[in-house]
Amino acid sequence: GVASGRNAVLFGRLIKIFGDSRTRQYIGFDTFDGYTQKELLQNPYLAKKNHLWKVASKNEVLKRCYANEVGDVVELFEGDASIEVPRVLKEHKGKKFQANKARFALVYIDCNSYSAAINSLKSFFPYLMPRAYIVIDEKIQGGETEALLDFAKQHRLSVVKPGNMQVP
């Protein structure tokens, strides 16, 4: 998810700091209105904090990106990631990629939901560069962690736990 756009700005700045703005971009997916009804039914524990993810509209996040001078390397897509990710990858001509020809060095999953995470991983997998990273950002283990572990097992990928952390 994109939420307020903090990671869009962070990754946008990293793209620029490393001089990759001619070849790389950040793409983000979010409903901008909390979890979908389907997600809430599948993951009832998400309902308690659903209001926390209704903090900014897509336009507000884009304004934040332009205010932080990264709007030119950021694209945001609104809707259910399970639907939007495969559609965008197959059909959308991005700022730095052609439809159905994108290649990614990093996929950063921050959605807290198993189905959104696993469906996004399945959609991005054919577009990953060799030795690409799949990273999750989950404060309380749940859907993302489970999706990553299931996906890694299905595809015989190694899961790295940085430092002395006991979770992926």
Predicted region positions:
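S-adenosylmethionine/decaboxylated-SAM
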Residues: 2-168
